[in-house]
Amino acid sequence: MSPGNKIQAFGDDLISIDVSSPAEAQLLAERLRATGDWIEVVGGIDAVVLQFDAVLHDLDLVIRKIHETTSQDEPVVAMSPDVVEIPVCYGREFGPDFDAVCAMLKLSAEELIALHAGHDYTVDMLGFTPGFAYIGGLDERLGVPRLREPRVSVVAGSVGIADGRTGLYALPGPGGWVLIGRTSYPLFDATADQPFALKAGMRVRFVAVPEL
């Protein structure tokens, strides 16, 4: 964290720390969690939010502890060395917005798939709904906004794009992302110690498949 990072207080027990990238957010969040001083630490895309015990810590002490934690030299942020390949069946009933995206962007089905699949991406964060993955690195030629009217229910495994990212639904739920496909990759396992397959910092690659 650099001296210029903005720190803001929200309410009596929340602090937000602005960062310059998702990678910096995850690194800072890991450092803060390691101290054991905080109730919860969440790394996002451009900020880290931490919750503290307002009875044990006043705001000045919290800010001082944050600076102490981050004053050491920052190591190089390394991405996960492994790439998780995620099979995606594009279009048809699996991607209800696929044809509309092709028409909007003046792309053939093959061109859209080629722009989305076969490239390495990085999971920026999980959020919105449990296990939902915000994945950075989307080709700028696939720039589309979110839906004006979000869907009440989206099938688990759905692959959406919007606002420069790919969104991956680990669980069914509402959502306004533009759906172009679906994966059969096991994104959620309730019996596992870590129930969600993806986490921030992981590298993924979408692979086009004809059927789920």
Predicted regions and their residues:
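Glycine-rich active-site loops that engage anionic ligands at enzyme catalytic sites
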Residues: 1-212
